[in-house]
């Protein structure tokens, strides 16, 4: 079979010569002496992989040929490239095409357009990436909040009318026609927080009719978490399409310890035939805007702020990662800032939120970002180990949360190797074949002949994250080499000058 596939590639070259077409480059690469983890979760096998062009041609005990570029893996693990199902790389990818925080984790494909916000129109974003490619592959969802802003105007806090919903549905159709994977929502953020369930369901149904998928930052990850879980289950039930919970978490003290109950509920939904899944990053603290903690959006509501301090994020666990009105606050906890201001933590939170709002109104730019420590380690482990949870970063290219540079190596080095939460094979599965399945990608995520040659070579004994809240951009160690579409973009821990990334469009149909 491998010989026939190789012959096919070489016949293409001869055909190109006959027709005067450009000659494709056959970047034949043979990787030998590798412990191959194919992404399925099966035990690793010692062997070799041959790459021809952008595809995996053969897997097994292969003999080098004179035309091969030989790479000796020296016993390291060779796995499929990692797929980041929840990425904010779109915020800076057009100006940071090397995508260093992703490549150095072994990530070869990012899925952007998350939390209800996407580049608009996607056609232009995709064209820019095709004209000047990045190092990584990119796929995208359509953002519900982006559609809402386009139809209703920014700052609108009303429920959409039937006419406005239809206008959103029309724009959604155009974006899906551009190749978007499906619809993303950020129902805890503005303006999604003001949408009705009917509005979201209508757009979800339109997405399902076109063969798309649904991913959601739930309407609440704390106060009204149970209702939010019911909402996404109902969307999956009514539409019949796959639905995914973004960065699944239990971000409130009263919810701590309830991961088994949640997973039982999700398993029951799956038994009913609802294709519900989740992604997760391996940290007990998140990053977002201050006002996401105040659903009424009132920075003067001291009772709501008191609840935040007691149940959602203790003052010592709130760290500011962006505060342009007073840049010296970056890296400090709320307790430290309150001390500098001679205020209580609650008073400081209220005042800082007001400053942030004023800055945003004046400049049109974000007034704050903060890290909040809200999750329990036991819940995190239970949710991560669920067979239908894949790994993500929820990070961008300039993310001051360590997840942006460390999520995947942290799972490999800490949770799989050191904590033995699951096997290395299972960890790789949660980073490759499982996310590919959740996204409907048919030719990525496994080491298998005919699949795209997105690969990562790493040392299972040393791989680990190094990024911290104080040094969030420290690259991981233990990731040696990375290939994207058959081209090496990282060699011996150093990036190459290649930019072979592609736009990955939805190919599924109703």
Regions found by a protein language model. Give the residues of each.
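Acidic, glycine-enriched loop/beta-strand segments at the rims
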Residues: 36-48, 364-375, 380, 422-428, ...
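Bacterial N-terminal signal peptides that target proteins for export
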Residues: 1-12
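C-terminal cap of metal-dependent C-N hydrolases
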Residues: 301-302, 310, 381-388, 393-394, ...
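Polyanionic/metal-chelating signatures
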Residues: 122-130, 145-161, 187, 208, ...
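Divalent metal-binding pocket/active-site signature
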Residues: 174-232
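Divalent-metal coordination cores built from histidine and acidic residues
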Residues: 73-78, 82-87, 94-185, 204, ...
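Bacterial N-terminal signal peptides
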Residues: 10-22
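Histidine-rich, glycine-flanked metal-binding segment
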Residues: 36-81
């Amino acid at each position: 079979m491998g010989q026939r596939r190789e012959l096919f590639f070489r016949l293409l070259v001869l055909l190109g010569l006959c027709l005067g077409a450009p000659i494709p480059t056959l970047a034949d690469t043979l990787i030998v002496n590798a412990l191959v983890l194919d992404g399925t979760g099966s035990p690793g096998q010692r062997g070799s992989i041959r790459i021809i062009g952008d595809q995996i041609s053969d897997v097994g005990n292969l003999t080098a040929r004179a035309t091969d570029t030989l790479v000796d893996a020296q016993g390291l693990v060779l796995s499929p490239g990692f797929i980041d199902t929840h990425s904010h790389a779109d915020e800076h990818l057009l100006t940071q095409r090397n995508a260093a925080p992703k490549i150095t984790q072994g990530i070869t494909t990012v899925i952007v357009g998350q939390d209800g916000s996407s580049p608009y129109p996607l056609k232009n974003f995709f064209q820019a990436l095709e004209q000047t490619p990045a190092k990584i592959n990119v796929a995208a969802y359509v953002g519900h909040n982006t559609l809402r802003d386009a139809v209703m105007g920014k700052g609108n806090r009303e429920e959409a009318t039937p006419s406005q919903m239809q206008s959103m549905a029309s724009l959604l159709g155009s974006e899906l026609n551009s190749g978007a994977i499906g619809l993303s929502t950020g129902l805890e953020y503005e303006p999604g927080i003001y949408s009705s369930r009917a509005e979201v369901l209508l757009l979800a149904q339109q997405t399902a009719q076109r063969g798309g998928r649904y991913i959601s930052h739930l309407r609440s990850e704390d106060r009204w978490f149970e209702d939010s879980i019911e909402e996404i289950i109902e969307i999956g039930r009514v539409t019949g399409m796959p639905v995914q919970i973004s960065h699944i978490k239990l971000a409130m003290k009263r919810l701590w310890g309830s991961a088994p109950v949640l997973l039982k509920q999700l398993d029951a939904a799956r038994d009913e035939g609802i294709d519900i899944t989740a992604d997760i990053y391996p940290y007990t603290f998140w990053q977002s805007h201050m006002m996401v903690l105040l659903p009424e959006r009132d920075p003067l509501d001291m009772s709501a702020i008191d609840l935040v301090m007691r149940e959602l994020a203790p003052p010592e666990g709130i760290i500011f990662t962006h505060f342009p009105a007073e840049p010296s606050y970056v890296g400090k906890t709320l307790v430290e800032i309150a001390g500098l201001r001679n205020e209580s933590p609650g008073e400081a939170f209220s005042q800082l939120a007001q400053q942030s709002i004023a800055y945003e109104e004046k400049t049109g730019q974000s007034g704050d970002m903060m890290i909040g420590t809200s999750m329990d380690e036991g819940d995190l482990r239970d949710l991560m180990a669920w067979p239908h949870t894949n790994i993500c970063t929820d990070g961008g290219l300039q993310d001051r949360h360590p997840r942006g540079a460390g999520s995947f190596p942290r799972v490999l080095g800490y949770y799989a190797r050191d904590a033995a939460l699951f096997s290395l094979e299972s960890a790789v599965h949660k980073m490759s074949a499982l996310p590919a399945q959740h996204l409907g990608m048919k030719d990525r995520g496994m080491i298998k002949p005919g699949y795209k040659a997105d690969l990562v070579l790493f040392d299972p004994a040393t791989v680990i994250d190094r990024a911290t809240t104080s040094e969030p951009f420290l690259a991981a160690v233990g990731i040696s080499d990375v290939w994207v579409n058959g081209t090496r973009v990282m060699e011996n821990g150093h990036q190459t000058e290649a930019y072979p990334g592609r736009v990955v469009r939805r190919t599924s149909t109703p």
